[in-house]
A protein has these predicted regions:
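Sec-dependent signal peptide recognition
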Residues: 2-7
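C-terminal motif of bacterial Sec signal peptides marking the signal peptidase cleavage site
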Residues: 14-15
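One face of beta-strands
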Residues: 19-37
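Short, solvent-exposed aromatic-acidic interface loops
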Residues: 36-44, 176-180
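Post-signal-peptide N-terminal segment of Sec-exported extracytoplasmic proteins
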Residues: 40-64
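Beta-sandwich interaction modules
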Residues: 62-73
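Mature, soluble, non-transmembrane domains
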Residues: 74-210
Length: 210
């Protein structure tokens, strides 16, 4: 099981959680990335699951194990050429986990994201002929789809992508996209249940004003 899959497994026992991915991407291909996994709306249930250590036969990582996984991410990401300002944080009062880093190319961005799940090497972001593309692959355990009794909870849980650029956006391929007034930020949100069943719902191709 990958590192942040371990954290998201807590969703099996939580009524609500939020995953927010933010990118500030510049024309020179550098940028800043952040990922927030937020269980604060159901912190009591999440804390109970962590304290039990096992629910419905599934092992729940301890707080110490979560800290270790975040530390391992920092170590792995620091070895990626072109990655910098790598940081993680955790809040065990509300169960909020964050990771942040900067990158000097999309290759570096992809390489850092691939340290989260070492079993696969994916191209998460690319730019072709001036079009910025996101090929979504969020680290949510596939086995959640088998938990039909959790469907309602997972429909309440949300994944949000917020991408900001230093030039104006002219169009976005995903019809669920919303734009800021400045036309430099695109927003996309879906519930976790739908994304589990179709990861492509979070895919997007973003074009810019010449």
């Amino acid at each position: 099981m990958n590192k942040f899959g371990l954290l998201l497994l807590c969703a099996l026992f939580s009524s609500c959680f939020q995953v927010t991915e933010k990118i500030t991407h510049r024309t020179n291909q550098s940028g800043d990335y952040s990922l927030v996994i937020d269980f604060s709306d159901s912190w009591i249930k999440t804390r109970a699951a962590v304290m039990l250590g096992e629910v419905d036969g599934e092992k729940i990582p301890s707080e110490a194990e979560m800290k270790q996984k975040l530390a391992q991410f920092r170590s792995d990401a620091s070895k990626v050429k072109g990655a910098s300002k790598i940081s993680t944080s955790y809040n065990f009062s509300n169960y909020i986990f964050k990771l942040n880093f900067s990158y000097n190319s999309l290759e570096a961005l992809n390489a850092v994201l691939n340290t989260i799940d070492k079993e696969t090497k994916l191209v998460h972001f690319k730019e072709v002929n001036g079009v910025f593309e996101r090929v979504a692959s969020y680290p949510i355990p596939e086995k959640l789809k088998e938990k039909k009794d959790k469907k309602e909870d997972l429909e309440e849980a949300k994944i949000t992508a917020v991408y900001t650029f230093d030039k104006q956006i002219s169009a976005a391929q995903n019809t669920n996209s919303k734009f800021s007034k400045s036309k430099k930020t695109v927003f996309l949100k879906h519930n976790v249940w739908n994304v589990l069943n179709d990861n492509s719902l979070m895919n997007n191709s973003i074009s810019f004003t010449p």
